[in-house]
């Protein structure tokens, strides 16, 4: 089984199986894309003026997991518990402060640092090639990477 680990806020680095999530797949990216050049064009001039400098752009990193559960209710309970671990208790206005997460993909040798989106509730079980319902729910989780320089797409062995 492929090992992927997660650190939420200042917590410990744990295997995602701690949450009942088994890694399936993730983005195929090998780095952040660059932002486009800043440019200015004037009607009375040919072409445009550019500033030939560009920084890395923010991006969404998507990860697929499966959850082995006997019912949708059990799978959604695991999702709810995970989602609640991603943020502090809502304040008096109902605002949640999300923790920064660090996702370590030991298979692809990636370290992704960003802010998590909550995983939506599962609605159906996965079906096999014979259209038989299996006790597996497939979920997709997105991490919003706001500062790509914190990520490492060539992580050394630890």
Enumerate the predicted regions with their spans:
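Extracellular/virion structural assembly segments
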Residues: 1-158
């Amino acid at each position: 089984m492929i090992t992927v680990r997660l650190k939420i806020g200042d917590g410990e680095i744990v295997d995602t199986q701690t949450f009942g999530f088994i890694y399936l797949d993730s983005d195929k990216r090998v780095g952040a894309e660059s932002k486009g050049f800043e440019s200015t064009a004037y009607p009375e001039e040919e072409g445009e003026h550019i500033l030939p400098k560009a920084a890395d752009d923010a991006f969404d990193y998507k990860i697929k997991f499966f959850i082995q559960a006997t019912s949708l209710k059990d799978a959604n309970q695991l999702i709810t518990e995970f989602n609640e671990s991603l943020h502090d208790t809502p304040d008096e206005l109902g605002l949640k402060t999300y923790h920064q997460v660090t996702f370590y993909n030991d298979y692809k040798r990636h370290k992704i640092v960003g802010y998590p989106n909550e995983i939506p509730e599962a609605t159906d079980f996965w079906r096999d090639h014979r259209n038989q319902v299996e006790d597996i729910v497939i979920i997709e989780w997105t991490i919003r990477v706001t500062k790509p320089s914190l990520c490492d797409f060539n992580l050394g062995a630890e």
